Amino acid sequence: IAIGLLFAINAIQAIGDFTATTTGGMDREPTDKELKGAYLTGERPLFHGKKLHIEQTIFNDGESPLKESRDIVLENSSFQWKYPLWYSKNIEARDCTWLEMARSGVWYTDHIRIEDTLIEAPKNFRRCHDVTLDNVYLANAAETFWNCEGIKLAHVQARGDYFGMNSTNITIDDFKLVGNYAFDGAKNMEVHNARMLSKDAFWNSENVTVYDSVIHGEYLGWNSKNLTFINCTIESLQGLCYIENLKMINCTLLNTTLAFEYSKGINAQINGRIKSVMNPSEGRIQADEIETLILDPEKIDPAETEIICPTVGEKLDKAPEA
């Protein structure tokens, strides 16, 4: 009991130390209260906080410390327990840390910008609008960025499966990801300078364009619509299948086998060799070499796909037996 009272007194004293200040930044009301060097514990210590500048503060055990907050600036602070920023608006965080137990950290929050920050907690950013991350490392990004709208990522590294599911209006530059099933169901997305190790990336996606990137992982892009790769290097077992409107410009396919199966609206310009192509439904494929070309007239109409390739090693009208 005495320890609990001490934590409560510390929180009350810290809140009592607010002093007037004004801080510039994103489109939000200026902050007018400052909290520095506090150690907060217990549930909802700053519930419904407004116009706060919080610096060098630890949010220890206790759920939802800044739930329903508005116009908050966080600097050099850390979250150590669950649900720190739910139903919040107009948030800036710089040089901060989300520890592993600060999971499900930012849900139902609008207009948040995070810079120079380490986030170890999974299941972050759900059903948020207008989220910007700059120079952020997501060490445990499992199930992160689900059902969000308006995402901007720059200089971001992430590790975890199911990143970016069903999110829309996404722009990314200088991005590294290790994790499968990335961007399943994503829509209206532009990616530059990415390096991804991801099986089943971009499944069920729509209106995605990827520039100057490297992607390793089988079954790339299945069931997607309007998927474009420009100046990309891809390695994918049975990748680029079941796609409607696939465009590839100046791309390289490394060790990519059984590509393009049942895809239609293909316009692919590939540098170098494709190891094998199997049963594309319709379109145009240009490459320097195709090692094995499989066109099964019982599965597709071979006349519907134009193959422009000076060197085709083996032509088959049936897929080889497994």
Label each PLM-derived region with a short phrase:
Residues 18-322:
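Long, distal/terminal scaffolding or interaction modules
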